[in-house]
Regions:
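N-terminal small/glycine-rich loop or linker at the start of catalytic domains
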Residues: 1-21, 75-78, 85, 109, ...
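Conserved N-terminal beta1-alpha1 strand-loop-helix module at the mouth
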Residues: 3-47, 52-57, 61-73
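Alpha-helical segments flanking ligand/cofactor-binding loops in enzyme cores
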Residues: 34, 131, 160, 190, ...
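A structural motif
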Residues: 41, 111, 167-168, 197
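Active-site beta->alpha loop and helix N-cap motifs at the rims of alpha/beta catalytic domains
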Residues: 43, 48-161
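Catalytic beta/alpha-barrel core
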Residues: 112-122, 143-147, 169-180, 201-205
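Conserved C-terminal portion of the radical SAM core fold
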Residues: 156-176, 196
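Catalytic alpha/beta core domains of metabolic enzymes, predominantly
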Residues: 173-218
């Protein structure tokens, strides 16, 4: 039975692409999409939405709207892509016209949610990217990577700042290297929730076989 207070985002293809350069066989993709549709997953993150690269990468590192339109997407889930925040900041600096080069307005896209992944220490640099995506009609999520080991004050001050922007719909924290234990998850959730009132999510890794219990703790 689905808990209506919890939304499940599946990022198997986006995260799994590190093993095959995001070059997935179409038959596998079709089977995967059918499976997640039957599993009551709420959101499917299809891949990255990256800037052009000089080396070969499969289509799911770009996950363009034209490419997505060729897929047989079930109607039930929402669909998402992820941006590597550092990539956009390093390559474009303050020029956010790059966002408009790779995103259409939401009304012309099958993507509903864009997640921006960025190191905890560089979160303040993500505001302009998120604001432009919001203006284009997308739901926008912040995925804080390398979020482990900060002080309660750091978490609270970060939550205050991003709440004040009004550009993020969801806040995620990632167990980037898989070393969080439940007490770490509890600390982060409690600290962020003091100043963040919108949905809060966790991206757990299973290095210590704690992904499930960490998710339940969150």
């Amino acid at each position: 039975m689905k808990n209506n207070n919890i939304n499940i985002l599946d990022c198997t293809m986006r995260d799994g692409g590190y093993y095959n350069k995001w070059d997935f066989n179409r038959t596998i993709v079709d089977r995967y999409l059918s499976s997640v549709n039957n599993s009551m997953v709420d959101i499917v993150e299809l891949g990255f939405r990256s800037l052009p690269k000089n080396t070969f990468m499969g289509p799911y590192v770009y996950t363009t709207d034209d490419f997505i339109n060729q897929l047989d997407l079930p109607e039930s889930p929402l669909y998402a892509v992820m941006l590597n925040g550092k990539e956009f900041i390093d390559k474009l600096g303050g020029d956010q016209s790059g966002i408009k080069r790779i995103f259409q307005k939401k009304e012309n896209s099958l993507i509903s949610l864009v997640r921006i992944a960025i190191n905890f220490n560089h979160i303040l640099e993500s505001e302009s990217i998120a604001r432009q995506l919001q203006d284009m009609g997308y739901m926008v999520a912040l995925s804080m990577i390398q979020a482990h080991g900060k002080s309660e004050k750091d978490y609270i001050e970060t939550a205050i700042k991003i709440s004040s922007w009004g550009v993020y719909d969801v806040l995620y924290f990632a167990d980037s290297i898989g070393n969080m234990v439940p007490k770490d998850v509890e600390k982060i959730c409690k600290a962020l929730s003091k100043e963040w009132e919108l949905p809060l999510g966790i991206h757990a890794h299973n290095n210590k076989n704690l992904a499930l219990i960490n998710s339940i703790t969150a």
